[in-house]
Structures are given as C-alpha cells and as structure tokens.
Swiss-Prot record:
It comes from Acholeplasma laidlawii (strain PG-8A). Keywords: Allosteric enzyme, Glycosyltransferase, GTP-binding, Magnesium, Nucleotide-binding, Transferase. This is Uracil phosphoribosyltransferase. 5-phospho-alpha-D-ribose 1-diphosphate binds at R78, R103, D130, P131, M132, L133, A134, T135, G136, G137, S138, D199. Catalyzes the conversion of uracil and 5-phospho-alpha-D-ribose 1-diphosphate (PRPP) to UMP and diphosphate. It catalyses: UMP + diphosphate = 5-phospho-alpha-D-ribose 1-diphosphate + uracil. Belongs to the UPRTase family. The gene is upp. Binds 1 Mg(2+) ion per subunit. The magnesium is bound as Mg-PRPP.
Length: 208
C-alpha cells in the first residue's frame, strides 16, 4: 500500500484556512496555493538521493551535495497549474510536463486529451500535482499515463484529499506515495470533498 503523508505544520494549517474561506479573493487564493506548494516541497523532497560534487568557494575548494535525479513536475490541467510555481521556486532546476484529462460520458472515467512530458521522466523523480484528490480517478489516470511512458519514481502531491480518493489511488498505484496538506472527511453526493475548499480550478482562475 502506498505511503500517505498528511503534513502537520502550523504555516501550512494557517494558509489552508485562507484557501478554505469562501470569501478569499481569487488573487489571494492563487498566491496562497503557490505558497503551500512551496512549503510542501520540503517534505516531498527530503528523501531524494544526492551526490557529492566539488565546488570552489571564495576561500578554497570543498565538497557539497546536489540532487542526483532530475525533478519533473506534472500538473493535471487546469487546477494543478496553481501549485507549480511554488514547487518550481524551491527547485528551479525542475522540468515541467503537462497532462489534460476529460471525463468520458459513458464510462465516467478520465481520458487523456493532452500529454507532454520531458524525457527525464524515465529516470527522474516525477511529481504529479493536483490540488484535490477526490474520487482519485484523475490522479490514477495521470499516473497510469506516465508509467506507460516509462516513469518509475512517481509521487502524488495535493492540497486536500479524502478517504475515497486515497483508497483508490493506493489500490491502483500502491507504489506511489501520496502527500497532502489535509485529509478531509468524505465526498458528498456530487463528488465534492467535504469540507474541502470548493472547485480549486474555478477559484484559481476566477471562473464559474
């Protein structure tokens, strides 16, 4: 079963309160989502492998460490875009791919309509980013697509999840760790996380 990490940090909790508030403006919501993405990055990267390199300081040569593998951020369009800048600010060397999904009207399952990834997904560490882990369908479909393209080290990064989404993702991809800022109570009858924060995409981009 895949590892589930729900971050417990006062700054993250403070910022989560801001984005849960229905009265928070689009601008503040978007900025805060990025800030939470940056804070989460410390947790999701703490076990990454490093290698020794030699650098020359103004005083003398010394041995330092740098990341061994390329980091690749893959947001699920469109809401996943809101977290990209925060993560990228922490790891500017990270490359960015994109995947877009739509829901098939008959099967109700997500289908990929757009996928563009750096070749580094083959040997790099891939972060699949989506603010909400609700049914788990989109996350599962995105990770399946990445694995079909050769990705081996994949992690899911979200803001809010629920037990239903976590269970599905762990069943479909038991090798994929899940990192969340919060684990909420449940899904309601129309598929929204409760208490959640509403539609993350609409709140990020000011749409209805």
């Amino acid at each position: 079963m895949g590892k589930l990490v729900v971050l417990n940090h006062p700054l993250i909790d403070h910022k989560m309160a801001l984005i849960r508030d229905k009265n928070t403006s689009t601008k503040t919501f978007r900025e805060t989502v990025g800030e939470i993405g940056a804070l989460i990055t410390y947790e999701i990267t703490k076990d990454l492998e490093t290698v020794e390199i030699e650098v020359e300081t103004p005083i003398q040569k010394t041995i330092c460490r740098q990341l061994k593998k390329q980091l690749v951020i893959v947001p699920i369009l469109r809401a996943g875009l809101g977290m990209v800048n925060g993560i990228h600010d922490m790891v500017p060397s990270a490359k960015i791919g994109h995947i877009g999904l739509y829901r098939d009207e008959k099967s109700l399952e997500p289908v990929s309509y757009y996928a563009k990834f750096p070749t580094d997904i083959l040997d790099g560490v891939v972060l699949v980013v989506d603010p909400m882990l609700a049914t788990g369908g989109s996350a599962t479909a995105a990770i399946t697509e990445l694995k079909n393209r050769g990705a081996k080290d994949v992690r899911f990064v979200g803001l809010v999840g629920c037990p239903e989404g976590v269970k599905r993702l762990q069943m479909d991809h038991p090798d994929v760790p899940i990192y969340l800022a919060a684990l909420d109570e449940k899904l309601n009858e129309v598929g929204y996380i409760v208490p959640g924060l509403g539609d993350a995409g609409d709140r990020l981009f000011g749409t209805k």
